[in-house]
């Protein structure tokens, strides 16, 4: 820790002191645990705020003494809070997923890869997937159940809305039964899963979890446009509305394969990070013990 500031009696509710300081990301989790052992989170509160730039020799020294590297560090409390938020079934989640699924349905009708990418980016489902991975690693059954419920209800509503819209469009003559072409060279992958579907889902799941733990949200865009969850859901809805029964099984399988791959890879990634960081902290503790 560096640049420690103590303001005695500054807090009013609850009454107490205000303590601030710069902490290397690598040491944040250890310090949070120490504060929790003192019941600071119950008697007061612990707040974290990222600092983009700090020009300070003391801060540089604190970072040098911290174990590992900042980009590799995982602040488990931060991830805990974030994944709790992502388990909640909100109107925003359902609306975004429904809009993304409708875009995917239009992409299937027009054989448009651009719309497929748009639907992938708009889909909000990865947050709930990450919450399930976190729940598995920390054996939080309640979190897993809530996240699974959010995913299930969200996709069910999104598919139902897209299905109804496709039916109405068919009834008013906007689209016809033959509108969904049998040959779609640009978007056929939506309903034809293969071994690469699972491989891509594994890679995307690992990358997605790493982007969350490292605080690199920009990498999530690459995750969104790699997996075929939302496009498969959109194609499923349109195929049912236009009676293209041969594509239904493939769409369902593609959706499940992508979800399973991301869940597996995300969980394994968190397990590895937890183990590696535990070893790094033990080594740092041993070094401190020898130098004191």
Annotated model-derived regions:
Residues 1-73:
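Soluble N-terminal domains of membrane-associated systems
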Residues 1, 120-129, 226-233:
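Short, proline-centered helix/strand-breaking motifs
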Residues 57-101, 107:
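Cytosolic-side membrane-insertion boundary helix
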